[in-house]
Every structure is written in structure tokens, then in C-alpha cells.
From Swiss-Prot:
Gene3D superfamilies, A to Z: DnaJ domain (1.10.287.110)
GO biological process annotation, one example: sporulation resulting in formation of a cellular spore
Record-given protein name: Meiotically up-regulated gene 184 protein
GO cellular component: cytoplasm; cytosol; microtubule; microtubule cytoskeleton
Biased composition (Basic and acidic residues): 124-133, 176-187, 203-219
Function: Has a role in sporulation.
Annotated source species: Schizosaccharomyces pombe (strain 972 / ATCC 24843)
Region (Disordered): 85-153, 176-226, 334-359
Domain J: from-to ranges: 12-78
Polar residues: compositionally biased ranges: 85-122
Length: 551
């Protein structure tokens, strides 16, 4: 809001009209018409801008002085301001910023014009003849002697002076500057707790010994949760897409049933080996476009496997661990069996209830058609399938579950583990290739849902963090069991297909088995996709750990 012209004391309207302050209204009118005609913009061609400004000032002065009310207000305000500013202008020699003593500043203030409430209407007070020393310190800077920014400089402005020291007392005292180290020590010692004082007396840590930190407190790096799912997989993100290029190598050297599976597409090929790649096929299953949700339709298969992730931010993550090459080899145990084509899926002692169920020796497939001479059978012994990696993993999971923060489990976690153990079951079903009713029963993939990422708060961070890791460990065990048994089924089925290619077979009898090959190939492809989804889940989990410091 603009001020009214009669209250603007910064402009002398009498000087603009070139009149005395006691001029009458008629003189003001006559002088205005004369000057308006002289400074009219039409009378000043070539200098219109300057003429317009002068003409506007004349109009403003005539408006204020021709009105009796406005003129009275203007005369009162302008006269008061004129006397105050002209007669009582503070002396520039008595700059309060030059006084370095509290006594000098106080004594000087007694003679100032602001010491009396009627200073604006009384006469100019007598200046004291006493002179003070104006010595300035050698360490002063430019901004110390700057005048205050408020309009009227008072004698009490030493309050805002940075050099004024209220502890100096009466008289002139020299204030010496303390060393930086002593100043920091004195300032910090007044506010530090007792524990910090004790640590301080022991001696501060020298940050110069660690030039990489530059004297700053090093940030605590959150530990990354390493996957304990299975040795079948690599935690390196570069090996996520390599599972689709998996190849099976069959060794011809000694054991006709020994082969090696490597999940890495860049694995070195052994000598004297031939590759058996799974042929391409057109899948009949409908999959979703969502990369983290895979569900088979009820028309094709009753099983489903799904991953649901809440967090959509996926920053880059690089793991320092190298991919582990896993191998599955059929070996010959010492004990003989009545069936020469039975496979043992457990060789180590059971670790838990699920391990006991897995270690049951079940004939995977039997047939009376493939009769070979005794010379072709190596020592008439049964072929056992060694599963040392899985037992080692289960033992590690048991050790991990007995950690200090995992000793006690909630009722929800125990119920979750019990339900999943019962629903998981044995993935191995008998593959019957008998002459009467040949059939291949595909294993049903259980629904294993990873726990959703928790939303932490500062209050229940520790409680929810512990519950989440308990649930995640239960999921890791179930998923490891599923992956291991599925891989066993795939390897055994490939071995059967190899044997069927070697021995002549009457395909009229085994028509159903031939049709089951395509189903097995689809199962293998879906299993590879499940592996990839699981790796992406672990990648998201590591990113969330680094972001929120969940460990």
C-alpha cells in the first residue's frame, strides 16, 4: 500500500513550486499554472521524458499544497522531520564501534540525545569535552567497524558491536584470541557428557592417519544377506539369464550314466563329451506379461508358482561372489540292490523331517523290456544318486536358524513352516515304463510364496526386521528343497531318454511315454523361468537391504 503524498516528508513541495512556506493559496495556484505551462511536455520537444517527470512533480505539489487539510498534515510532519534530521544529526566522530571498553560506551551514552525522552523538541545537548582513546585492535576486520543497517544510528548500538565484550568490566582491557585447538576444547567440554569426557581424555583419534576419510566419520556399510538357497545357483546377477543356456554333458570315459550339469552357459566343455540340448518347443501354457508373477492355467496343470514384489525401484547391484559350478553325478555304491535300475536319492544322514522324507529310496523307473547281457551291466550294482550339496545346504540352514537372533520363533512362523512342509510333499512320482500301462507322472510344483517386503518404521524396526528374516529363512528352505528335487527329476528323466535312444524300443507300446517327453521339456523350461524369478527376487532383496539397512 502506497503512502499518501501529504505524509511523504522526503519531498519538499515548496521547493518544487519555488515558493515560501507562508505562501497563500492564490500564490500557489498562480505559480503552479506558470510552471505547468513552462514544463509541459508539448512545450519541450526532444526532452519529453524529463518534462513528464517535472510536470508530475508539479501536479503532486499542487495537489498537496492547494488542499488545506493535506497542507496542514504535510507542514506538521515535514517541519518535525526537518528539525530532527538537520539539527540533531549524530556526530560521525563518535562512532560507537570504535569503543572497545564497556565503561567508555556507558559514559558516552549519558550525553547522547536519546538519553532524554524530549530530545526531539529540546535544544541540542552540550557535547562532552572529554575525549576517549580510539585505539583499535590489530586483529580487527572490516565488518567489525561497519555501521548498523537501521536508519538512525544511536549511541546504544554498541550492543550490536561484535567487539563489545560484557565481561571486560570497567576500564580498557585487551582481549586476546585463543588458539583454535584450545577454543574447541573449552567449548566442547561444557556440553559433553561424562562418557564423552572420559573418551576425550584418552585422546581423540587422529583422522590424518586415514586420509581416505578426510576427518569425517566413515559411513557404516550395511551387510548384504547372502542367499543360502542352494549351490545350484549363483548370486551374481550376470548369471541370471544364463540358466536358459544350460547344457548337459555326458562323459563316455568310465561310467555310462555319469553326466554333469552346469547352470552357466559359459562353462568349459570337458573333453570326450557330447552335448544333449533340449529341443525347442512351443509351450501350451499361458504366462503373464508380469515378470515377477508366473501362474499356470488350470487347464494345463494344477500347480502354480508366483513371486510378488512390492518395491519397483531396482538400483544397480553387483555381487562380489563368484558363481558356483554344481555337478550331479551318478555313482556306484557298494551295496547291491535287487533292481539294477534303481536310483538312490539320499546318501547322507537326515537333518530334519523333510530330509528324512527325501532320503527314502524309491525306484524312479523300472522296466522288463530293457534286458541287457550281463557283460553290459557294470558289476550288476545299483546306481546311487549322490546328494551331498543339498545335505550341506540343509545343515547350513540349520546352523543359520540357531543364530542368536533366530533362536525363538513366533507361532506364525512355526505354522507357516509346518503348512509348507505338508503341502510340499515329494516331487518324485514313479515313472512306470511297464508293458501293461506305461506312464510318466510329472511332479507337481508347490505354491511357495516369498514373504512380502516389510514397511519399517522407527518404532518397530527391530521387531519387524526379525520377523521378516524368520519368514524368509523358512521360504529359503522350502525353495531349496523344491529346486533340488526338481533338478533330480529333470536329470533322471534325461537319463531315461538317453537310455531309450540307445536300446531299441517298441514305440507302439510306449506311446504315452513319447508324448510325455514334450511335457518334460515344458517342465524344464518353466523350471528355468522359476529360477530366474527367484534370482530377481534375491536381487531386489539385496537392493532393499542396502537402501534401508535391514541387517
Amino acid at each position: 500500500m502506497l503512502a499518501r503524498p501529504e505524509t511523504d516528508t522526503s519531498v519538499d513541495y515548496y521547493a518544487i513550486l519555488k515558493l515560501q512556506k507562508n505562501a497563500t493559496f492564490q500564490q500557489i495556484r498562480k505559480q503552479y499554472l506558470f510552471l505547468a505551462l513552462q514544463y509541459h511536455p508539448d512545450r519541450n520537444p526532444g526532452d519529453e521524458e524529463r518534462a513528464v517527470k517535472r510536470f508530475q512533480r508539479l501536479q503532486l505539489a499542487h495537489e498537496v499544497l492547494s488542499d488545506a487539510t493535506k497542507r496542514l498534515i504535510y507542514d506538521q510532519l515535514f517541519g518535525l522531520s526537518t528539525r530532527t534530521r538537520s539539527q540533531y544529526k549524530p556526530n560521525s566522530t563518535s562512532n560507537p564501534s570504535k569503543h572497545t571498553s564497556a565503561y567508555a560506551s556507558y559514559n558516552k551514552g549519558k550525553n547522547s540525545k536519546w538519553s532524554s525522552p524530549f530530545a526531539s523538541t529540546t535544544k541540542k545537548p552540550q557535547e562532552s569535552s572529554e575525549k576517549y582513546s580510539k585505539k583499535s585492535s590489530t586483529r580487527k576486520k572490516e565488518h567489525f567497524n561497519k555501521k548498523p543497517s537501521f536508519p538512525r544510528d544511536t549511541e546504544y548500538s554498541h550492543i550490536y558491536n561484535m567487539k563489545y565484550d560484557p565481561r571486560s568490566g570497567i576500564g580498557i582491557r585487551v582481549k586476546r584470541q585463543e588458539p583454535e585447538s584450545l577454543k574447541k576444547e573449552n567449548n566442547n567440554s561444557d556440553y559433553l557428557p561424562k562418557s564423552a569426557m572420559k573418551q576425550k581424555k584418552g585422546g581423540p583419534k587422529d583422522s590424518s592417519k586415514h586420509p581416505s576419510n578426510d576427518g569425517k566419520i566413515p559411513e557404516s556399510k550395511p551387510s548384504v544377506y547372502k542367499s543360502r538357497a542352494s549351490n545350484l545357483f549363483s548370486s551374481n546377477e550376470q548369471s541370471i539369464h544364463s540358466s536358459f543356456g544350460s547344457k548337459f554333458h555326458f562323459d563316455k570315459s568310465s561310467n555310462p550314466f555319469s553326466f554333469e550339469f552346469s547352470p552357466s552357459s559359459n562353462a568349459a566343455k570337458p573333453s570326450n563329451s557330447e552335448e544333449c540340448n533340449i529341443p525347442k518347443f512351443n509351450s501350451s501354457f499361458k504366462t503373464s506379461n508380469d515378470f515377477f508373477t508366473f501362474t499356470k492355467t488350470e487347464e494345463s496343470s494344477p500347480y502354480s508358482f508366483s513371486f510378488k514384489l512390492e518395491d519397483s525401484n531396482t538400483p544397480k547391484f553387483k555381487s562380489s561372489s563368484k558363481p558356483v559350478k554344481s555337478s550331479f553325478v551318478f555313482t556306484k555304491p557298494e551295496a547291491e540292490s535287487s533292481n539294477p535300475f534303481s536310483f538312490d536319492f539320499g546318501s547322507s544322514g537326515p537333518k530334519s523331517r523333510s530330509d528324512t522324507r527325501n532320503n527314502i529310496r524309491t525306484p524312479l523307473w523300472t522296466s522288463s523290456v530293457f534286458e541287457k547281457p550281463e557283460s553290459d551291466l557294470p558289476n550288476k550294482t545299483a546306481f546311487g544318486f549322490m546328494r551331498s550339496n543339498t545335505s550341506t545346504f540343509n545343515q547350513k540352514c540349520d546352523d543359520f536358524s540357531s543364530a542368536s537372533f533366530m533362536k525363538e520363533k513366533t507361532e506364525f512362523e512355526e505354522q507357516l513352516q509346518e503348512d509348507n512342509d505338508h503341502s510340499l510333499g515329494d516331487l518324485f512320482s514313479k515313472i512306470n515304463i511297464s508293458t501293461e500301462s506305461p506312464s510318466v507322472a510329472m511332479p507337481s510344483i508347490p505354491v511357495i510364496q516369498p514373504p512380502s517386503f516389510p514397511i519399517f518404521s522407527s518404532i518397530d524396526f527391530n521387531v519387524r526386521n526379525r520377523e521378516y528374516w524368520n519368514q524368509l529363512m523358512v521360504f529359503q528352505k522350502l525353495y531349496s528343497k523344491y529346486c533340488t528335487e526338481s533338478q533330480h527329476f529333470i536329470n533322471s528323466w534325461i537319463n531315461i531318454k538317453k537310455e531309450l535312444h540307445i536300446v531299441p524300443v517298441n514305440w507302439e507300446i510306449f506311446e504315452k511315454v513319447e508324448k510325455s517327453w514334450d511335457q518334460c521339456e515344458e517342465f524344464v523350461a518353466e523350471f528355468r523361468q522359476t529360477e530366474e524369478k527367484y534370482f530377481l527376487f534375491l536381487k531386489r532383496l539385496r537392493e532393499l537391504i542396502n537402501k534401508n539397512q535391514m541387517l
